[in-house]
Amino acid sequence: MSEQQTMSELKQQALVDINEANDERALQEVKVKYLGKKGSVSGLMKLMKDLPNEEKPAFGQKVNELRQTIQNELDERQQMLVKEKLNKQLAEETVDVSLPGRHIEIGSKHPLTRTIEEIEDLFLGLGYEIVNGYEVEQDHYNFEMLNLPKSHPARDMQDSFYITDEILLRTHTSPVQARTMESRHGQGPVKIICPGKVYRRDSDDATHSHQFTQIEGLVVDKNVKMSDLKGTLELLAKKLFGADREIRLRPSYFPFTEPSVEVDVSCFKCKGKGCNVCKHTGWIEILGAGMVHPNVLEMAGFDSSEYSGFAFGMGPDRIAMLKYGIEDIRHFYTNDVRFLDQFKAVEDRGDM
């Protein structure tokens, strides 16, 4: 058998073996069989010793060409095996996107959170700044800076959680206003709202809680008038309860404002005709307000002959109870999913 015939048969057999290799391990064995140090192609070089010198270069070239041909076939088969393996893996891991996905329960904002954010958004649009303060407060800022000295009889109006004689849980967010006025007097107008939790020694029932939320507002500037306060409160009432709402101001008393008023809104359920919500009066009380007392301005460093201001305070708990017909304030704090899920449905309808 000639060398040419031997190489031709070797090539054909190598191609058959390569095509029959069904995995990378089998293909590696074929490579060793033909191209390894002791492989068939390497063995052809042993035939060169029996060839005339003038034929050796041509023979060596043909052996190298055969080696390259087999290597190319091996590389091609290798790529094919890798592709087949990947396709098989993809087929096994295929996700049927036509199937319905897993239902993921999505929560919703707590009704108090939504009410607070609604109020905050309104006042941010009016140029107010949101200021937060300490929940553990000094008696000085919680009472004395608000025209409530230790001897003032109005202190009996609200029982407090005292930690020491001078430290307590704040009973309102008014200390934030006092601290802000004290730190900013002489720096221009003050225009802030102060949301947060407050604490009072009340027995928990349907309308009272030892912990609840409050939002207070404060404006201090030159020539601030009662009419400015009334216009602000009218806008607030329409935003919270509907564009056709009206407000009513009734004289009242707060130590830190003078004059002081209670603010009522026309009943959004009966349109002022009288119902169980408004106790058949046509009006619902929503907040307290007034012009900042000159003593409060002076204690904070403002000249009360030059500056004036108004303040107001409301309970988002009460606002939310009125808006959504909630009869017991304790529902807000008991984490009852059955209660909270009702507001998820309202939110989905876009009513909140």
Curated annotation (Swiss-Prot):
<dbReference type="GO" id="GO:0004826">
    <property type="term" value="F:phenylalanine-tRNA ligase activity"/>
</dbReference>
<dbReference type="Pfam" id="PF02912">
    <property type="entry name" value="Phe_tRNA-synt_N"/>
</dbReference>
<keyword id="KW-0460">Magnesium</keyword>
<keyword id="KW-0479">Metal-binding</keyword>
<dbReference type="GO" id="GO:0005524">
    <property type="term" value="F:ATP binding"/>
</dbReference>
<dbReference type="GO" id="GO:0140096">
    <property type="term" value="F:catalytic activity, acting on a protein"/>
</dbReference>
<keyword id="KW-0648">Protein biosynthesis</keyword>
<dbReference type="GO" id="GO:0000049">
    <property type="term" value="F:tRNA binding"/>
</dbReference>
<dbReference type="InterPro" id="IPR002319">
    <property type="entry name" value="Phenylalanyl-tRNA_Synthase"/>
</dbReference>
<dbReference type="InterPro" id="IPR006195">
    <property type="entry name" value="aa-tRNA-synth_II"/>
</dbReference>
<feature type="binding site">
    <location>
        <position position="258"/>
    </location>
    <ligand>
        <name>Mg(2+)</name>
    </ligand>
</feature>
<comment type="similarity">
    <text>Belongs to the class-II aminoacyl-tRNA synthetase family. Phe-tRNA synthetase alpha subunit type 1 subfamily.</text>
</comment>
<keyword id="KW-0547">Nucleotide-binding</keyword>
<keyword id="KW-0436">Ligase</keyword>
<keyword id="KW-0030">Aminoacyl-tRNA synthetase</keyword>
<protein>
    <recommendedName>
        <fullName>Phenylalanine--tRNA ligase alpha subunit</fullName>
        <ecNumber>6.1.1.20</ecNumber>
    </recommendedName>
</protein>
<dbReference type="GO" id="GO:0000287">
    <property type="term" value="F:magnesium ion binding"/>
</dbReference>
<dbReference type="InterPro" id="IPR004188">
    <property type="entry name" value="Phe-tRNA_ligase_II_N"/>
</dbReference>
<dbReference type="GO" id="GO:0016740">
    <property type="term" value="F:transferase activity"/>
</dbReference>
<dbReference type="Pfam" id="PF01409">
    <property type="entry name" value="tRNA-synt_2d"/>
</dbReference>
<dbReference type="GO" id="GO:0005737">
    <property type="term" value="C:cytoplasm"/>
</dbReference>
<dbReference type="GO" id="GO:0006432">
    <property type="term" value="P:phenylalanyl-tRNA aminoacylation"/>
</dbReference>
<dbReference type="InterPro" id="IPR010978">
    <property type="entry name" value="tRNA-bd_arm"/>
</dbReference>
<dbReference type="InterPro" id="IPR022911">
    <property type="entry name" value="Phe_tRNA_ligase_alpha1_bac"/>
</dbReference>
<keyword id="KW-0067">ATP-binding</keyword>
<dbReference type="InterPro" id="IPR004529">
    <property type="entry name" value="Phe-tRNA-synth_IIc_asu"/>
</dbReference>
<comment type="subunit">
    <text>Tetramer of two alpha and two beta subunits.</text>
</comment>
<dbReference type="InterPro" id="IPR045864">
    <property type="entry name" value="aa-tRNA-synth_II/BPL/LPL"/>
</dbReference>
<keyword id="KW-0963">Cytoplasm</keyword>
